[in-house]
Amino acid sequence: MLPIGQKFYTRTKHRIQQGKKTAGAWLQIGSPFTAEILGRAGFDWLMIDMEHGPGDIMTLIAQLQAMKGYGVDAFVRAPWNDFVTVKRILDAGANGVLIP
């Protein structure tokens, strides 16, 4: 939880605010190994697709853990528009959520 008044920044948001381009990749394979490989590839962000991909919340947690430490922002496309699901995605450690 952020202290009151502190803004939430990600590497991707910071680069966009500076007018710089970002590069990312879309993950539809529910594998932490793929997430780690792409996390190490130098992308600014990765989008984990839970809407059309095979992953559930446990797969997501494994993917986020595999990406951690490589400086890549992790965004997640939620499987549906449900606030409980969105909260679970954010609690798992995602930097942002795309809601279909």
Can you describe what each PLM-predicted range is?
Residues 1-100:
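Expand to "…catalyze enediolate/carbanion chemistry for C-C bond making/breaking, isomerization
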